[in-house]
């Protein structure tokens, strides 16, 4: 019998914040048990350090440049199969509880059921404009300044509903006459900023030494060009937060992880209570990481380890606990789910591989590279990343290149791009970028997509509105973000 698959996804969780990845203070007993009894992929990366595009590449097993979805307001075609499509063809009942950030009329992309509304807009509200990029109403320094304790926030409201619906679905499946195995994706918004948590989770870190950034805030001159643009976009350029502000934000981030852990525990308890745990693969990951003050940077949108490296844990009763050091990324999930489910062969080439091929190997396969890209706001040109063995290469035709040796320089402080001894490696990486991506064609496609979506957005905001959001109710425009309010006014609406 094919196994059930429970896919737990969180938002903006950097791998290094979990004990399974070396942290010393995180209180996350449910995730700790999952890691102790499962497979921990030590070097897992997202393929695009931004919420929606990361999910698109993960769902399709392809890079966003290949599926034509470039930012947080992009849709990918309904004809592109996702893991939900492949699993349904293999006989699975597929359901989604929580955030997936689908844009456009197709709000299912292969899922049979959606148990909640999405947290964010499904329209083109957030289309970037490379031709005339201005300050957008998104991340800003208030996320750090207001960090601390709250009783309730919109993110708490949302994740409580996500958990309730997921638990209810597990019980519904146990009572159902539907004999198909299930695939349930439970997708949370924590620990995404603002850095707020309830007092009971804040108090878990009383007396703990909160780990401060290893690399303190850099001067504008010491930052790479993309970091400077991001800091300008966040309204943080030239701001040096006090140590107590940084510590408070990081403590609240840990508190959010602990809160998240308590929700995940409820879902796992339901799995055990129904007996489904005996035949269920549990997969846990995040869409991307969080800079968390390193180099004076916050949030995501860059290729530094804090923003790019994500936790990836797979647990099943019949899979031996182990740690895998090979490079992996989120595009590997589609072929892995397909392998577990016995899905038909993919109809097109995929970027990812089956992670099960990396387990218990006396002779592990040669290390393949991991690719990532950034094609969204706050850049005038595509930025590409290749991680091959210990080296990370970041390339932008506008900004130049960076090369880091992560074994010798884990904090990514020494750019080796101009090092004479590293020139053969730099040239090889440059050639790999040219082979992997046709930048001229990609830029043309991105600019045209932005113009098209901006026009459609303006048209849809004129006259009678027809919303794409799944199951949209009148109150959703108040509860969840729909572009009616300013983003930060909505995100910081807490008590």
PLM region spans:
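A contiguous, mid-protein "functional segment" used to position or interact
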Residues: 417-465
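Residues forming the ATP-binding cleft of Hanks-type serine/threonine protein kinase domains
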Residues: 407
């Amino acid at each position: 019998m094919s196994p059930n698959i429970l896919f737990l996804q969180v938002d903006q969780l950097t791998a290094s914040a979990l004990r399974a990845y070396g942290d010393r203070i995180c209180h996350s007993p449910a995730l700790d048990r999952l890691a102790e009894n499962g497979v921990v992929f030590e070097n897992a990366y997202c393929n695009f350090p931004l919420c929606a595009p990361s999910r698109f590449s993960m769902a399709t097993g392809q890079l966003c440049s290949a599926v034509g979805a470039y930012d947080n307001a992009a849709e990918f075609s309904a004809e592109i199969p996702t893991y939900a499509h492949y699993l349904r063809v293999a006989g699975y009942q597929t359901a989604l509880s929580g955030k997936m950030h689908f844009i456009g009329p197709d709000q299912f992309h292969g899922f049979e059921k959606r148990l909640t509304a999405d947290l964010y807009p499904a329209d083109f509200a957030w289309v970037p404009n490379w031709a005339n990029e201005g300050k957008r109403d998104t991340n800003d320094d208030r996320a750090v300044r207001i960090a601390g304790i709250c009783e309730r926030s919109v993110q708490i409201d949302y994740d409580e509903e996500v958990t309730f619906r997921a638990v209810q679905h597990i019980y519904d499946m146990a009572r159902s006459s539907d004999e198909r195995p299930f695939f349930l994706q439970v997708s949370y918004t924590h620990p995404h900023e603002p850095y707020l948590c309830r007092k009971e989770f804040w108090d878990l870190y009383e007396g703990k030494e909160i780990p401060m950034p290893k690399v303190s805030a850099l001067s504008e001159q010491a930052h790479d060009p993309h970091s400077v643009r991001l800091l300008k976009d966040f309204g943080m350029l030239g701001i040096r937060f006090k140590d107590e502000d940084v510590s408070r934000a990081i403590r609240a981030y840990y508190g959010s992880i602990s809160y998240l852990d308590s929700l995940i525990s409820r879902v796992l308890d339901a799995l055990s209570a129904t007996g489904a745990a005996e035949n269920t693969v549990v997969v846990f990951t995040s869409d991307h990481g969080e800079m968390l003050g390193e180099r004076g940077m916050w949030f995501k949108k860059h290729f530094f380890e804090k923003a790019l490296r994500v936790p990836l844990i797979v647990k099943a009763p019949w899979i031996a606990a182990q740690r895998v050091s090979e490079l992996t990324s989120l595009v590997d999930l589609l072929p892995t789910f397909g392998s577990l489910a016995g899905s038909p062969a993919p109809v097109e080439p995929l970027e990812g591989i089956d992670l099960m091929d990396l387990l218990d190997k006396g002779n592990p396969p040669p290390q393949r590279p991991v690719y990532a890209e950034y094609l969204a706001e706050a850049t005038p040109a595509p930025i590409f990343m290749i991680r091959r063995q210990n080296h990370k290469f970041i390339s932008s035709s506008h900004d130049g290149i960076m090369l880091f040796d992560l074994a010798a320089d884990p904090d990514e402080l020494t750019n080796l791009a101009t090092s004479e001894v590293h020139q053969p490696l730099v040239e090889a990486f440059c050639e790999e970028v040219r082979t992997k991506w046709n930048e001229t064609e990609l830029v043309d496609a991105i600019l045209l997509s932005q113009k098209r979506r901006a026009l459609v957005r303006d048209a849809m905001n004129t006259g009678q509105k027809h919303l794409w959001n799944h199951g949209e109710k009148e109150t959703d425009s108040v509860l969840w973000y729909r572009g009616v309010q300013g983003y930060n006014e909505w995100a910081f609406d807490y008590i």
